[in-house]
Amino acid sequence: MSLWFLVFLSVLQGVTELFPVSSLGHTLLVPALFGMHIDKHAPQLLPFLVALHLGTAFALLWYFRERWIALIAGFFASLNGRKNDEGHLMWALIIGTIPAGLVGLLLEKRIERVFHDLRIVAVALIVNGILLWLGDRIQRARAHRPPEKLTFKQAFFVGLAQVGALIPGFSRSGLTMIAGNAAGLTAEKAAEFSFLLGTPIIFAAGLLELPKLFHAPDQLADALLGGVLTAIAAYLSVRFLMRYFEGRGRLASFGLYCALAGLFCLGWFMFHAQPV
């Protein structure tokens, strides 16, 4: 793998995993525009992608480190019968993780086979943009209402939204932010819950494939560099996004980008052969 391609994929993963624009969709579409085909199951590429997932997860853990310490402490306090907001949120995160975790383990590879056509991925990206626009309307409609605490049923609903991100072109963070807004969270709280909820899923995606990283010792240097670059890009991305939504940033901006990018890619692959 060339150095520029390594840097490109690392930064692309770190940014698009957290921005509501679909990391998997971008990982497939953007290289293809340059005539490159990305096979995430290729033996020479898989260890590198494992490191990218772990880099993203470590960046999220570091950014929310104080929050996670409070959540874990609150969780153990709740086990002792002491009700508290942090414990409630930790239970909500556990419940919200279940749907995507189960479906991902059972169906991820089947879903990927169905959506191997890049034109379908482009259409999914367009739909993702429309959903973000609708989510923005929900966000604005609730802007003057007091924020609500998620019930466990709502947390499950938000977690269920993560399942859609198994389809290339749909964004995990985008779908969960939309669901969080629909459940009554402010834009800032919906973003925070989305990133907290995504951390164990992203971590698990890397850890499940971790043994394959050590089965390719000749690629450890590339994987390590990629993981570090992704962690830096992911950390800067989550810091930007949290400030963006704290300042009443809107999902519609990302929705417009996804719709335009999806339309461009759809038009491109209607008239150009897909790389194999």
Swiss-Prot record:
Chief localization: membrane
Transmembrane segments: 1-21, 44-64, 87-107, 114-134, 150-170, 190-210, 222-242, 251-271
Enzyme class: hydrolase
InterPro entries documented for this protein: UppP (IPR003824)
Listed EC numbers: 3.6.1.27
GO biological process: cell wall organization; peptidoglycan biosynthetic process; regulation of cell shape; response to antibiotic
Disulfide bonds: none
Catalytic activity, as annotated: di-trans,octa-cis-undecaprenyl diphosphate + H2O = di-trans,octa-cis-undecaprenyl phosphate + phosphate + H(+)
Keyword Zinc: no
Membrane topology field: Multi-pass membrane protein
GO molecular function, one term: undecaprenyl-diphosphatase activity
Keyword Lyase appears in the UniProt entry: no
Keywords from the named record: Antibiotic resistance, Cell inner membrane, Cell membrane, Cell shape, Cell wall biogenesis/degradation, Hydrolase, Membrane, Peptidoglycan synthesis, Transmembrane, Transmembrane helix
Family: Belongs to the UppP family.
Other facts noted in the record for this chain: Bacitracin is thought to be involved in the inhibition of peptidoglycan synthesis by sequestering undecaprenyl diphosphate, thereby reducing the pool of lipid carrier available.
UniProt function note: Catalyzes the dephosphorylation of undecaprenyl diphosphate (UPP). Confers resistance to bacitracin.
Protein name: Undecaprenyl-diphosphatase 2
Species for this entry: Burkholderia thailandensis (strain ATCC 700388 / DSM 13276 / CCUG 48851 / CIP 106301 / E264)
Name of the coding gene: uppP2
